[in-house]
């Protein structure tokens, strides 16, 4: 009996029917992100989106792509996959709002050793939730089965977003000056950076049971705290931009304070921050203690409880914080801009 092509493909480790099943299961989640600007549905060769630039004189598209990194290992060890997609969206959309852009569309890419439809659907459920939080549409994606290249129970996740901003409203730090105020938007935890170090600190790969331990000072098990999804700041930050002049926005990711805050600073300006004013969650204290990590390395690796930093004129600081609080952000004054370069932690 002659084998069909699909049967041969299945014998090679790629289950096409599982792919079809995954798509059917994820449709209900993707539907939550659809708007009147979306044309068609899943299954096309490309995602179609009507670009509405009314009110903009010179619309500029801005794109961003990122992944979740080795935080995925925590999700795999805990067998919890319904929030990791939020992280993927957050890592992309939080970057594009640093230029003042509103995210419009999102696409995801999942590579897996074996397509388990229920697991893939759970991942996409998180991606869709992230898109809802960011106000963008999930217009497409790809799930690639990689037999022989990845273990069956492993996967990788990455995403891509496109946003739009009027050219005249692209964030410009040209007016930044000494005396301006930096505002902190709290993180939910480690977010999606530094997990290779986190795994080493707790020897998670060799002792995954540590994820069930609640350390002194923490109110939840380590695994739950580490897997808390990255916060999406799109709506509160755009709300501030709608009413005030924002001079700089920094998404605090890999490289912590020292690498990311300077990316939004004007040349000749430094961000002075009192370490005592940084509201650092207990999780970071536990990591520093358990890993014997220096304070400098902590601020040079992790967000230390601050997921995003905005810079505004001093007369706008109170109003900016009020707007952020109205959108659910427990924002606070982080520090000030002074003459110099980089970040000064005092």
Regions found by a protein language model. Give the residues of each.
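Glycine-/charge-enriched secondary-structure boundary and capping motifs
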Residues: 2-12, 28, 119-137, 150-157, ...
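Glycine-enriched loop-and-adjacent helix/strand subsegments that border the catalytic/binding cleft
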Residues: 20
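Hydrophobic face of alpha-helices
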Residues: 23, 121-124, 195
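Glycine-rich phosphate/pyrophosphate-binding loop regions near the starts of catalytic domains
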Residues: 28-188
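Short, acidic Gly/Pro/Ser/Thr-rich loop/turn segments
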Residues: 55-56, 68-71, 166-169, 190-192, ...
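Short loop/turn motifs at secondary-structure junctions
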Residues: 100-102, 197, 245, 330
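Short, acidic (Asp/Glu-rich) active-site segment that either coordinates a divalent metal cofactor
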Residues: 156, 169-218, 222
